[in-house]
Each structure stands twice: as C-alpha cells, then as structure tokens.
Amino acid sequence: MTQSQNKKVSVPDNHSVTVKCTATFVPRYNASKKRRFITQIKSAKITVSGYGFSWKKSPTITKRVIDGGRTGEILCLGVIKNPSGFIKQVSLSFEFYCNTGGGIEVR
C-alpha cells in the first residue's frame, strides 16, 4: 500500500519548496488485537520541487515502524540547492498511521 505526504520548506524571497515523501507499507492483520498493523516499510522515496531546487546529493532516509506498528516514520536528512548556488540543510519527519482496517493515513 503506497501513500504520499508533502511538507513545505522555506527558501529565500518568501518562497517555499515542496518535499514529497512517497512510501510503500506492508500492513498485516493481528488476530489477537483484531486490527491491522504496519509490519514493514518496503520503500521510501523523497523528492523536492519548486523554484529550481533539487537535492545536492541523495538524502539520507531512515525508515522506522513505531508505536507498536500503528505508525510508520520516515526521517529525511539532506541538502537542497538551486541553480543560483543557494543551499539549505533539510531535516524532516514524515508520519503515516495505519488505521484498524489497514489503510494508511497521513498524520
């Protein structure tokens, strides 16, 4: 199951760029708890867009299943740059919640 979440990052001239996290989750049913939980974050991709910004190099991505499997957390640490030479360090956390039916929701 794939879900995406966007976050805004401020850059010069009162602009902001969009950092988008797209992740694929594996939810499984737990009979004793009578609900689904995230058992694995299969993949995570993080992109940046707006005002010519891009990653200076691929960001470091850390995937964690927390809160007993109710939440998938993607941590992103990287540097964005634009053609003018402006650079900015970006550190973001994206959280996704697994509802009782196994659907993945943005928090």
Residue ranges and their predicted role:
Residues 1-107:
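Mature secreted bioactive peptide module from preproproteins
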